[in-house]
């Protein structure tokens, strides 16, 4: 029934490659099937002006798509001179989610910028990005601990994300592009490694959905995220 | 317990004033307590280029805050030369929600732009905006039917929105600013007049939240939205 | 003869509502007939860099129109990414006029920003804005004196403004939109409460005008401004 | 008494050099003493979209200062990415003034763009620009008549401009920079060759001014403009 | 003597991976040692407006660096709102070089956009980009021929590029970052597969260089490019 | 054979006028035939932030074309809100070339900005700009030495530039516009007064060129630059 013959609850093959590029303190290529996102974590000492002198750190994220990561070429945002509303919405989501996973006091007056650049898109880029970014964040934190810049581990828990939705009347997990573009309802869920909710964003693309459907989607998301966290842990071990 | 002595489930006084300004096809001042948003609906014939010739209409929204609608003055976005990520995120939410309420085929090749401008902010501006924008939309649709530009009523149902959250460990509805800035969890919910979900966006500002808390918030939102729809209906009658 | 049946020298009903919104140190809704402008004055300690250490203050203004304050919807300047030349011309005029009314030494190293946002436009928005902004300025100065931030009153005199013009061959005062768009000559005058000139900007939209016509317009402006100042004084008392 | 030993009514030496550059249909270097502005008129067939099919033409102007036309270097507007409010205010003034001199019906569906670029600044750049632009406009109109693109002469009258002001308590004409920066009142006047008013913009930089002072300044302006028109006519003959 | 122990004439290991991503008509990852650039060629029917109806095609290029492709993080150009001068200079160079390799008449009214995005930077990104872009271009042309969109092969010859320079007094080929940043002279050379020159850009970073040094660098470049073309041909066969 | 009847090696008449405008520390009008560029050098104490405290100076350049310096009017870059890629490429070239001529240690913590504004264009504007800018630079350096701001002369050597190219199969020097637009190969060369190379940028506009053609062009450039340096020296003496 699904174009890929997956069962409703089945995610795509998920792989996480650490140290994908050389310079960043954390550099992860995350793949959810044909969706491939490069997540780099850049650690710098110091914080933005609005946080100076408060003894706490900052984590933020930026998101971009390579112009031909998509089926037809998109305009390059740098050439157009501004980031789209979609881009801003996504990078705000990624940043919020990562900040929830970090104890800012333990991070001290240091900043981590996570860049999530989509190399190839096939649906679910924002949830793949959060999943990969969390691993890059861990690597950057470990780098800083190895350097003695921070003492205790600021990571409160791993976070991971998945998209779920209602497609042809059925709740499915980890939608690929052709499912996503035909879905009646689309929901992105970010959870901790213990299944608590960090962020939930559900949208009725077609018909409004009921509380029952919402609950069904949540269960699906929780199960998928448990599997995804296992992939994160395997990559980190 | 709440700064305003409201019960957890109690919304602020909500008023909807139609025909607040003279030129727009729909013009509504919506007030959720001290949050005041002017929502105007502008009806024009024709659609954006990407929809031409498809026999369907378009609904979109823009959002702004007057520089001193807030406690301390914010920079004017027109002077800075760009809209913030927050602004774009909100106006995309408003637009999506309103489009869910309209049958685009019945709208025909016509466009409605909803401008939501915050005159005074005290938390919940985006949910107030959606609530007021829906009434302005109805007025603009009725205007167009009165002019004979559209035949059947494209409105599928009324929509309304409320913010709910966990504040000092308790689930409360319709957060005002001091509650919102201290909330552990913040959730914006958009529903139809019959209580189906259009959009749900929940964020753990502090600690991650559980499924039980999510359910509790949803019930609170559903009840509040039922009341808010009654205010919409009273204003429209 | 005038669309509103006013006599040539007659202004529209002018009302000034103080404390229109809650947060600003001065907040005034000024109405010249159907033209409605919200003027807020924001008082902050400190001055822009170019004035630091000179023992004097700064007053500046920004102007905007809500997209549907006009007959047909205008593009939102924040979305277009820049303020129009008209907007900049008007806000420079408002700022210059207000600075003329303030003793910058007595203001001390403090800044007042006046935001003039047009809620509904029917001609004469810039002169209404100056008139309302002056009252908001007074409120902000009084607020600062009440707080003990400034000692002596920096206000040198009240200022007010009106548009005058030649319409169907006759000099008239306080043009509304349909008069304004058909006027042969359009002149905006800003004066002190004692009738001295702060700014005069006259433009031949159609035929060039003579010195005699200029003088006639000035007399008209002086008389109208005297009345408008009375409204300001009544609002402030 | 004046830094240049001029009498109050005396303008600086004014020269107008036509055909200063090779490519433009009209190209004029205008000098008011040490203020030097290059004014080029570019004639193109066709009109902007908002005028299409109405059988009339369009005249507009743009203004710029070379970065080191001034005493200390100004930022290049092209590098900063926007034109200042002052620039926009000035180019709007120049455009309005020139449009007043042209019969748009006789111009037909053709456009003239006047570029006024300040090579060297010593006060009065906008009035010098208007004066030179008018001559460049005449050359471009004659070029188009020579080509047979337009039949009748669309020029209604020559226009010229001068700045006048109150300096050390006395009304003076054609202020140079050090006078301008110390003037209590500054007024720019644009008139037709027969002394009718096209535009008047007077600002109290220091103290408000009286009607008597305004009249005195107007007389001064009228006399100076009469002389300046003579220079235009000599250059054109 | 070289940090990598290469001989002066020795290039880094060069690899070209085709079909690196799925959507583009040509997609190549090119590696010059640790410099890695993703080059995608997007083929679309139609040409930009300035070429319409002339029976010829268009080839253009855009260039970007991922923010953390470099040792320390660079600002994201999309977030800053503009491309740097360096970026524009490089993408203009890539576009010119590729256009020299294509017969625009045989391409017909079709457009190819080449996006060169630097995944990891270690010197020579622009020459690596040209080398990889040429292979992506060939793939896109073959794709279009396979589809029957174009008949004859528009490729005139392969092109490839290398950077050469004078480092510690000696002419060397294919500079890596630490050589590049210390080089006295830096020269980028683009040649055809038969060794004719498409573009040469040489800059004295330290001391001016002599004609003899220029010749020596050219010989070095020619030899390296011959080797690089062999890598291109092997990748394409 | 050349449109101007020049011999292949013959440059256009070249004139250099110093002190062309009044305010700049160096102000030069350079003319290569009908190409006229105003080059001003602005000397200011202090350096940009990235150089602070390093005991060395900075030289940079900006380039612009007046909108009607060209055959048909170009958009004003300040109005469009950004500099074109071509503009940025050229001003980067000018800046690099001038920095090669200055000993930054001897300049001390001072900055020189060179503005090159094209008054009239007929090919070769960037090489004319470099030639004129060098003379303006010398004047600014001498001004600073006269003021005692710098002690020793930071100028290492004069630099000058010329464009050469292959036109109708023959190597020619100092191309004017109609030659430039038809040239098969176009090369800009910047040299020191002793004939060493500062920058060489050669582009095959049509067919790729051979090493022999490159050498021929270089000889031509060297001879022309020797003559141009003589004009510089004559102007400076």
Curated annotation (Swiss-Prot), chains A, B, C, D, E, F:
Amino acids binding phosphate: 86, 124-126
Coiled coil (UniProt feature): none
Catalysed reaction, written as an equation: tRNA(n+1) + phosphate = tRNA(n) + a ribonucleoside 5'-diphosphate
Record-linked Gene3D superfamilies: GHMP Kinase, N-terminal domain
Keyword Hydrolase: no
UniProt keyword Transferase, yes or no: yes
One GO term of the biological process aspect: rRNA processing
Enzyme Commission numbers on file: 2.7.7.56
InterPro entries: ExoRNase_PH_dom1 (IPR001247), ExoRNase_PH_dom2 (IPR015847), ExoRNase_PH_dom2_sf (IPR036345), PNPase/RNase_PH_dom_sf (IPR027408), Ribosomal_Su5_D2-typ_SF (IPR020568), RNase_PH (IPR050080), RNase_PH_bac-type (IPR002381), RNase_PH_CS (IPR018336)
Family designation: Belongs to the RNase PH family.
The name this protein goes by in its record: Ribonuclease PH
Species of provenance: Shewanella frigidimarina (strain NCIMB 400)
